[in-house]
Structures are given as structure tokens and as C-alpha cells.
């Protein structure tokens, strides 16, 4: 039905957005509920200015709720009572924060209408009940998604071994391709592994099953659609050549991105200057070493540039050459550990965004010395250089900070997805997810 609606309305919904339909639905329901309670119930004599303030407050409410995990499905929690507890806790925290913010705004702008206890209780109860709909098991567990594999035994086993590492695997039923495929209307996916050897099977599928409710995909397309990443082992030369990896920097979309980089980085530099000053004082007090640390990084089209960070390691930590940070790295100072977790050490890089060496969102720039090794072992590594590097990116919000060749390869798979699927809305999602990571103190912590 969803596919039919897309055809009727000519909808071209991005891949990353399709997997977050529930999040968007509950986000907009929460937004509408907040505005209804704030503007309609118990309110009189609303002016345009008051409505505008209420709308801004509703956006902040939804952002706080997202950061606290109120729109999560809590899939990793099996016990429904634990899910309810998590949702209730997140709701109470969000209510407390928005209530405090409302009180602060009333002090600054006395003409505003305060939230009041009745409204805040009504918002909390009604919002909790609506959000609980997504975790209550109203229906039986849906049937597993069937995937029929076409390919030789090695290709099939390789694919199965690859997807077993993802939680998505539990919702799949992997089947061998057969000419006895059920012609039922249930959703099915036919995954074509390998290349030329499967031409007969491919022709048979298109001739006999194209009218059914199924997807016919390559592993490349399936991973992009379901994992929102492009694993390098499924990026064949054919797939590589079928897509134009050159970005038109003169297009309106990329000009808008650059305008946003300049505007937001300038504002953030001003707002974060007190934090940078306080952090600088703490760094100096701890070991009396230099405050800033400068590095050479590789940027757009392989051009090298210099970035500035707040120093988080002991002086002379790299006297034997650059190495990746490790978990519980003894080189990191006490203040440095906090700065890394909150990503405060990255704030001076806003200057690099302002001058055009970096973007707010994009692949993280790497050091030339480390890139020598990465390019030797990772195929298509230089593809990440077709766009400006960023302070945060799709890899950073989806994959823990890595410290190995394998981690770099996994991060590249997310970066290639970002390059192929770039949009203003995807940048906005990454920006919000970055705020969530920072608020949860999940900054630069290596996974090994």
C-alpha cells in the first residue's frame, strides 16, 4: 500500500526518511498536541507574537523529547514495563526542562502567558499516552521479511555472515531462491548476488514475479536501503561507475549548504566563546601546557589544511609520531577526557568551517600520515574527498569512534551513503543527532 501511495502521489521519499516514519509521525503529533494545549486550552487574547513564542517553545519541547529518547521504539528492551518506565522517565525529564525554560522566558518577557500546572500536567499525561501507543503490543508480531537469495553457496554464506552482525537479521527469513516462490501478496525481496552467472535466474524472476509485491535488489541496493550504509565489499566496479561521484558545488543545494555553514558557525562561535575561554583556563591550570593543538588534515579534493583544537592530551604525546587514540588512553588529561566526551575540544574548528576548509556536516577529516595506511588497505577511500569534511557526519552519529582499519572501513560505508543521499533534511537530522550524542556524553570514546 505504501508503494502504491508513492506511485499515485509521485513521492520520492529518501531512504533514510522511510525507516524513520514512526519517529516523524510521533514528532508531529507531539508538536500539534503542545500547540493545541498552549494556544487553545486555557488561553485568551493570543497575539501573533505570543503564538510565535509558543511555536518556538513547541519546537524546543520536541527537540528535548528527541534527545531524551521519547520518540524511540525501545526495540532493545523486551520487557514492556521497562519500556513504559523508560518512556515515563524521559517524559518527566522533558516536562521539567520545558517548565523551567518557560519560567525563565516569563521573567525575560513578562507579557508571555505562563504554562501553568494544569497545562503542564495535561501535556505530560496526554503526550505520554500518545507516545505509549508505539510500544504497546496491540497486534501480534508481524511475519518475518522473506529474502530469497540468488547466487552460489559462497556468495550466499558471505551475505548471511555479513548481515548476522546487525539486529535487523532477527526480522529476516533468509531463503534459497527457487522456482517455487509463493505467489502470495506478502512482501518479499529477491536478492541477486554475484554477476553474469545468474542471468538465467534474473530473467526468470523478471518474467514471472515482477507483478508481485516484491523488491528485486543487488546487495549494494539492499544495504543502502536497509542498513543506510554502503559496505565496500558490495560496491562493485559496476556500481562505482554507475554513479557520478562528482559534486556540483555551484548547484543551489550546495550553495545553500555553504550559506548555512557560514551563518551557523559564526553564531556558534559567538555563543560558545565563554565555553572555550573557561575550557582554556582549565587546560592551563591542569598542566600549564599550551591551550590549543594544531594538526594538518586532508580536506576537499585532497587539499591539506590546518585545524585548531583544544588540547586534550599531555604535551609531547606524539613525539614518536601520530597514532589513533585508544580506550582508556593514558595520554588524555583529566580535563581532556571531559572535553572529548562533550566534543567541546572540537569548537575551535568552527573557524575552519567559517573560512571554507570544512563544513558543519560531512566526513571527518583524517591526518595525512594515517591516510597513507588507510588508502593502502581500503578500496575507494578517496571517494570521501569529493565533499568538504565536517565537524560531524553520518558515520559519527551511527558508528562509535573507531581506532582501527576495520573501523575506518565501516565509517567509510556510512560516508558513501551520505554522499549518495545528501539533502538539507539529512544534514538537519545529523545535526540533531549530534546534539543528542553530546548531551549524552557520547563523544570521542574509542570502541577498542
Where are these regions (language model features)?
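A short, structured surface patch at a secondary-structure boundary
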Residues: 326-388, 430-434, 438
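N-terminal hydrophobic signal-anchor/signal peptide
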Residues: 1-30, 133-270, 448
Amino acid at each position: 500500500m505504501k508503494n502504491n501511495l508513492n506511485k499515485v502521489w509521485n513521492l520520492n521519499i529518501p531512504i533514510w526518511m522511510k525507516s524513520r516514519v514512526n519517529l516523524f509521525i510521533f514528532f508531529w503529533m507531539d508538536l500539534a498536541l503542545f500547540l493545541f494545549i498552549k494556544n487553545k486550552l486555557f488561553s485568551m487574547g493570543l497575539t501573533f507574537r505570543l503564538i510565535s513564542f509558543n511555536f518556538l517553545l513547541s519546537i524546543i519541547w520536541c527537540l528535548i523529547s528527541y534527545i531524551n529518547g521519547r520518540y524511540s521504539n525501545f526495540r532493545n528492551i523486551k520487557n514492556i514495563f521497562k519500556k513504559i518506565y523508560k518512556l515515563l522517565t524521559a517524559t518527566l525529564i522533558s516536562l521539567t526542562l520545558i517548565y523551567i525554560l518557560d519560567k525563565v522566558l516569563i521573567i525575560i518577557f513578562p507579557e508571555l502567558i505562563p504554562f501553568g500546572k494544569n497545562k503542564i500536567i495535561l501535556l505530560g499525561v496526554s503526550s505520554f499516552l500518545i507516545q505509549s501507543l508505539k510500544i504497546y503490543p496491540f497486534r501480534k508480531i508481524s511475519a518475518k521479511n522473506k529474502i530469497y537469495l540468488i547466487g552460489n553457496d559462497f556468495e550466499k554464506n558471505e551475505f548471511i555472515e555479513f548481515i548476522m552482525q546487525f539486529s535487523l537479521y532477527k526480522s529476516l527469513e533468509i531463503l534459497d531462491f527457487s522456482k517455487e516462490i509463493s505467489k502470495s501478496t506478502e512482501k518479499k525481496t529477491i536478492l541477486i548476488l554475484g554477476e553474469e552467472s545468474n542471468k538465467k535466474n534474473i530473467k526468470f524472476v523478471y518474467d514471472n514475479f515482477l507483478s508481485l509485491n516484491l523488491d528485486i535488489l543487488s546487495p549494494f541496493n539492499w544495504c543502502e536501503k536497509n542498513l543506510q550504509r554502503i559496505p565496500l565489499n558490495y560496491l562493485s566496479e559496476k556500481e562505482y561507475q554507475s554513479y557520478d561521484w562528482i559534486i556540483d558545488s555551484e548547484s543551489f543545494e550546495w550553495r545553500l549548504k555553504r550559506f548555512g555553514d557560514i551563518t551557523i558557525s559564526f553564531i556558534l562561535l559567538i555563543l560558545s566563546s565563554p565555553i572555550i575561554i573557561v575550557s582554556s583556563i582549565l587546560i592551563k591550570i591542569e598542566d600549564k601546557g599550551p591551550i590549543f593543538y594544531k594538526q594538518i588534515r586532508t580536506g576537499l579534493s585532497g587539499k591539506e589544511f590546518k585545524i585548531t583544537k583544544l588540547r586534550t592530551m599531555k604535551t609531547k604525546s606524539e613525539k614518536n609520531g601520530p597514532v589513533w587514540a585508544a580506550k582508556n588512553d593514558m595520554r588524555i588529561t583529566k580535563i581532556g577526557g571531559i572535553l572529548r566526551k562533550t566534543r567541546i575540544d572540537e569548537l575551535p574548528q568552527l573557524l575552519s568551517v567559517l573560512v571554507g576548509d570544512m563544513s558543519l556536516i560531512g566526513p571527518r577529516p583524517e591526518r595525512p600520515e594515517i591516510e597513507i595506511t588507510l588508502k593502502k588497505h581500503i578500496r575507494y577511500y578517496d571517494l570521501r574527498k569529493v565533499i568538504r569534511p565536517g565537524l560531524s557526519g553520518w558515520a559519527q552519529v551511527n558508528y562509535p569512534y573507531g581506532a582501527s582499519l576495520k573501523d575506518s572501513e565501516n565509517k567509510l560505508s556510512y560516508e558513501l551513503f551520505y554522499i549518495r543521499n545528501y539533502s538539507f533534511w539529512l544534514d538537519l537530522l545529523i545535526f540533531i543527532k549530534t546534539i543528542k550524542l553530546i548531551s549524552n556524553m557520547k563523544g570521542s570514546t574509542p570502541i577498542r
